[in-house]
Each structure stands twice: as C-alpha cells, then as structure tokens.
Amino acid sequence: MEIRGALDLRKRQVLIFLVLLGLSRAGTESAHYSVAEETEIGSFVANLARDLGLGVEELSSREARVVSDDNKKYLHLDLLTGNLLLNEKLDRDELCGSTEPCVLHFQVVLENPLQFFRFELCVKDINDHSPTFLDKEILIKISEGTTVGATFLMESAQDLDVGSNSLQNYTISPNSHFYIKIPDSSDRKIYPELVLDRALDYEQEAELRLTLTAVDGGSPPKSGTTLVLIKVLDINDNAPEFPQSLYEVQVPEDRPLGSWIATISAKDLDAGNYGKISYTFFHASEDIRKTFEINPISGEVNLRSPLDFEVIQSYTINIQATDGGGLSGKCTLLVKVMDINDNPPEVTISSITKRIPENASETLVALFSILDQDSGDNGRMICSIQDNLPFFLKPTFKNFFTLVSEKALDRESQAEYNITITVTDLGTPRLKTEYNITVLLSDVNDNAPTFTQTSYTLFVRENNSPALHIGSVSATDRDSGTNAQVNYSLLPPQDRHLPLASLVSINADNGHLFALRSLDYEALQEFEFRVGATDRGSPALSSEALVRVLVLDANDNSPFVLYPLQNGSAPCTELVPRAAEPGYLVTKVVAVDGDSGQNAWLSYQLLKATEPGLFGVWAHNGEVRTARLLSERDAAKHRLVVLVKDNGEPPRSATATLHVLLVDGFSQPYLPLPEAAPAQAQADSLTVYLVVALASVSSLFLFSVLLFVAVRLCRRSRAASVGRCSVPEGPFPGHLVDVSGTGTLSQSYQYEVCLTGGSGTNEFKFLKPIIPNFQVHDTGRNMGEIENFRNSFGLNIQ
C-alpha cells in the first residue's frame, strides 16, 4: 500500500509539472501597457474594465485585484471606475538597471467564476540623470615622444538612463593638442579615447589641464564634466602587454568574501621606472567596484562582496596595466557566476478564505504563487497537498495556483480541515517549503423564520394616544447565530390608498406594534396589513403574517339634528289645525349620530313645552304628535324643546326647538316662498348634508313601512289609500322638492321640503292632512291606533 501511495503521489506531481510547463508557454501572450518613470502616484495607466470587456459593477462584484509577480504593489485597481492607477512612483533605473526594455509583469484575478488575465507594464525611461564621472580628476602621463594620432584610454562617464537618454557623446576643451574619439564597442557602450592631435613638448609645456564633458541624448540634454590632467614625460617606448585580451573564470555564487578570483599580469620590456606596472579597473561600473577589488602591484582580483546569481549572472571587468612612463595596455576579465541551489521555494498567498459554507462546491479557498530564485533544475518546482482531502490544486498562470474545494462538504462530519501546501524544487539537494492553511466550515441559512400565528387580530379603541402599544407578533428561526436573529418589518400594503406608514410602526427587534396616531372609528373601522420576519442570514430568508386591526367605537359624537334646522335665524313653525284628533302627527325630529352600535341608538323625549300634556314625542322615532283634542282655550303659539340622546357611555345629547302654531283650518299648504331667488347660488355644505341624511333616513323609513305593510297584508286585506299633494296653481319654484309618503299612522299626511341653495331660510313644513274617505269597517282599527298612541304617552283623553 505504501508503494502504491508513493506512485500515486509521483503521478500527481508529474501531472502538475506538465501543466505548469504548458501554462508557462501559454502565458506569454499578455496585454501591454506603458508608463513613464517617476510618474506621480494615482496617475492613470489604463481602464481595465474596458480592456477586459467587463462592466464596472461586474469588476467590483467579482472582487477584481492586481497581483504582481514579485508581490509588490506597484499598481492599484479602482473598483469604482475600473481604472488601473499607479500606487507608487516607479524608478526604472532602480527596477531594471541597464536592462531594456523594463517590463513589470502582473495579472488581474477575478472571482465567481475564477479568471486570470496576464498583463505587462513597460516603464519608459525619462532623462532624469546626468552623466557623472566616478573620478573628479583623470591623470594621464604622456611621453613627449608620443606620435600624433596616439590614443589614450579614459574613464567613461556613468549615466543611469537608457536608450536615447543615455550617454551619447564626449567633448574636450581646450583642444589645441587633443580631440576625443569614440571607438566601436562590442557591448555598445560609448568609451572616450583621447587622441593626440599635435606633438607634445616637455620643455614648452610639462602639464596640460583639460575639461572632459560627457553629454547624453535627452531633450534637453544633460552633461557632466571631469578634469583631465596631462603630464608630459620623457620618452617611454614600450607599453605593457597582456598575454591574452580576454580571461574567463567561473565562480560559484556561494564563494566566501575575500576569496581569490583570478590573477591578471602584463609584461613591459622597458627597464627601471618605465618597466614597473600598476593594475587598475577602468570603465568599471559601481557594481563591479563594490563586488571586486584588484591588487595594483600583483594584479590579483579578489571577491569583495557576496555574489548572487539571481541578481547578476556575469561581470565584464576591464583591467588596465600602466607602466611608470604612462604607457598602458588593457584586457578583459569575464567572471561568470555559477548558480547553486541556495534558495528554497517561496509561497506567496494573494488571497485566502479560512471559512467556507458547508454546502458549497468548488469554492476558492486560497490563491497563491510559488517562486524559486534559482535557475535550471534548481528553479523547477513541484506543488502538492495531502491525499484524501476534499480539496485540489488548480494551476492558473505560470507558478500560480488556486486551492479549491472538490465537492459540497458536511460540517457535521468534520468542522475543519488542516491543509499543508508543499513546494519542492528539483535541485540537489532538494529544498522544500510548507505552508499550512486551516479551513473552517460555516453553517448555512436553510430555515426561514416562522410566525407563531398565520394571522393576528388586534383591537384598539378609537381616540387612542399616539405611540400606543396595540399588540405584538412573534417569529422563531431554527438556525443559530446571525442566521437565527429575526428582524420585523411592515410590508407594503396591498391597498395603495392605505397610509400604513402613518398608522402603525413595528419594533424591528421584538415585533411590538404601535399606533402612530389617534385613530377615528368614523374614518377607519378596520385595516389589514402584512408583517415580515427576516433573518440575518445570507441570503436572508423571510416569512410573513397577516395582521388585522379592528378599531373599537367610542361615544365621541353627539347627536346632530337634521330637522328642524337649528340655525336660529329662521325658526321653523309647524301649523296644526285645531280640529286635529289626538295622535295627529305635528312633525318629526330627524337626527343622526356619527358613532355606531349602541353609541348611535337615539331616543327622543320632550324636554320643555309651553303647555305640558298637549304634545308628546315618540321615544324611538322622534315623531311629535298631539296628545289630546285641541280646544279654543289652548294658546295659539307653542314652543317645544325636544331632547335627542344617544345610548353611549356616558351618553351625549342635543336639543331641537319647535314652534307650533294652532290654526282654525287650512286647505292650501302654508308655504311662504322667498320673494326673490338669490342672484347667485352659493354652495351650502349644511344643505347638502341635510339632503343626504334626509334621503338616507327616508329610504330606511320607507323600507320599514313597506315591510310593515307586507306583514299586515299577510294577516288581513285592507284597502290602501294614497294621499296626494296639492300643488298651488301657477309657476312652481324649481328649488322646491315635493315629497309625499304614506306611513303607519291612521291618517295619511303630506309634507314638503323647501330647500334653498343660498343662505335664506331652510324650512320643513307639514301641510294640512288629507283625510281619506275610509270605509266603515276601518273605524275600529283607527280608534285602536289612537288608543295605542295615548297609552304610549300615558295620557287619558276624554
């Protein structure tokens, strides 16, 4: 079993290795951007949303981010605009040195689904460095016997810029004896050579001071200068010579400091001081001078600072041998740095998710990159995790991996996983790096809140105080943690005309319901709305319940007298013939109550009368009738005060004042008409109210009469008599309405309503009753009704 497990592991490693090779080849195609060095922080580089063909919202929702190969944050992606911005100033000379072009590699990572896009940022050079000489003074010794056209090597200037901004030319002044020549170089660098243009004469001028100027190709160009001191010597006809022009050595990068690298020696055929040779570096960069040193007498080159193959793979060192007479020779030492497996693989985590939902499959756990600074087999790597884990490694670009869950997990079986990422290189000896990740499984929100009832009925009495607690709703959630925390809310009402937001509110935490304002039963008897319970899971689950609020009526409205009108300006006078029989209907007090139920049950009673015992009021319908026969001794004018009282607790009441005029007889309606109609009809709200209320009461009264008549007809047959209203001859005003009706009285009577639209007198007049010619067999029934009327008032009329 162990051998088989080892073979499986070996197969997985080989497979990942092959995928890495394929991705390394496929990843060469990248999008290119460019930016000038030293550009300010926050400067615009490109719009990634447009280049990737994505919307800004999608870029933000998919958590786009920029990952550099060296894991440095040179760039910043603004998720609000999709713009790629500089996160820091870039110094091309520091980043790439003399390498051209200077390219920084990075990639854009998108999640849900996981995608990678490869990009390159080219840092363009600007002319921000002037040429500089390492030595402030260059000393050259030239024999006076030197022939015209002889050349002398000089130290070159250093310019950190590249391309056209780098060093381009040299000039020297004054140039009476010399000029500058720039020879062709295999490394394409510009080295100055001092050329003798006119023979020197030691006796005339033993020393010359010249200024060497180095000029770059920038716009505008920058320059640097150094002093060239020429000392004229006596004749020295042999220059030092090296056995070979090029020396090559290979040095492992772990060579200790102070170690010997090579020994370079030259020969000079001259004797004495002219045959003494000194060795120096020339045209040497700062890196060479920091890394190596040369013994000026022996020519031995030693290591001064550590070598690092991952930084510089080779050094080209120019060595000059100068004799005592000022003649010199040169050679080149090529030092090749040998790579050793001295760098273990590095694991850089770009993003990590330490908690994932238990029911999610193929969920991104970690995004990471691996890197080995070594080269060859020393830099090749194998990445793996433990077997028998429900996770797998998915390669993306070169040396980039994602750790993804393989299937939906079960938190109840195993709540956490410890994953070890192992990266091993193929060097000798093999080096490896391990990185541990602990993944926790979180519970999912799979239960919606449940109300204790599907519907609630709440009762609140009208005229309540604002912010009154009227009831509560409650819901529970079987989940745990935030998934079980319930928030309550009011849902939009189905009736769009219901101002729910101004009627009730709910406490989001405990479900308590409050009335926001005082409720009026007469305006709103009941209303329904829905409440929602939402948990705090993701995604949130919710449920709803129906709440019905019933407003209980309170006795807050007093009875309102519709007839007779109590405006005080035009008292209503009722005409009663002195020949009226007991029980004669004088008028009817009509009143309404805005309340409902027993609060709107009205009763009538005679409160005051000019002559008590002459008139009576029926308690249930407000009819005013004569209680006995009228006589000549009775006063002609009577004033009656009728009390209208509801059945509420406490009861409310109103009074109506009637004026009754006794007349000897009338055959035509006593109906005074207004002298002139108002010029303009003005709307009177009280008149409209009266018409509506009177029509409602009349309809109800008529229905009661019809029902009563139907019942009586079932018991016995009787002849129906119909009273008719006599209308005066001549033109009849259009604002008068003629109403005739038949009630349950023994007499048929007629009445007219005189309504005006203006502010004139509104009157309700009872006309002279029309006594029909009843048959003899109805006399007993009529007398029985009169007797009942007497008994209802407790009167004994002879």
Swiss-Prot record:
SMART domains: CA (SM00112). Keywords: Calcium, Cell adhesion, Cell membrane, Disulfide bond, Glycoprotein, Membrane, Repeat, Signal, Transmembrane, Transmembrane helix. Its main location: membrane. It is a single-pass type I membrane protein. It comes from the Eukaryota. The chain crosses the membrane at residues 687-711. It is found in: Cell membrane. Residues 712-798 are cytoplasmic. Disulfide bonds join C96-C102. Coiled coil: none annotated. It holds the Pfam family Cadherin_C_2. Residues 35-133, 138-242, 247-347, 352-451, 456-561, 568-671 form the Cadherin domain. Residues 27-686 are extracellular. GO terms for molecular function: calcium ion binding. Glycans are attached at N169, N359, N418, N436, N487, N567. One of its GO terms (cellular component) is membrane. The keyword Repeat applies. CDD domains: Cadherin_repeat. GO terms for biological process: calcium-dependent cell-cell adhesion via plasma membrane cell adhesion molecules; cell adhesion; chemical synaptic transmission; homophilic cell adhesion via plasma membrane adhesion molecules; synapse assembly. InterPro entries: Cadherin-like_dom (IPR002126), Cadherin-like_sf (IPR015919), Cadherin_C (IPR032455), Cadherin_CS (IPR020894), Cadherin_N (IPR013164), Protocadherin/Cadherin-CA (IPR050174). Residues 1-26 form the signal peptide. Potential calcium-dependent cell-adhesion protein. May be involved in the establishment and maintenance of specific neuronal connections in the brain. This is Protocadherin beta-14. It comes from Homo sapiens. The gene is PCDHB14.
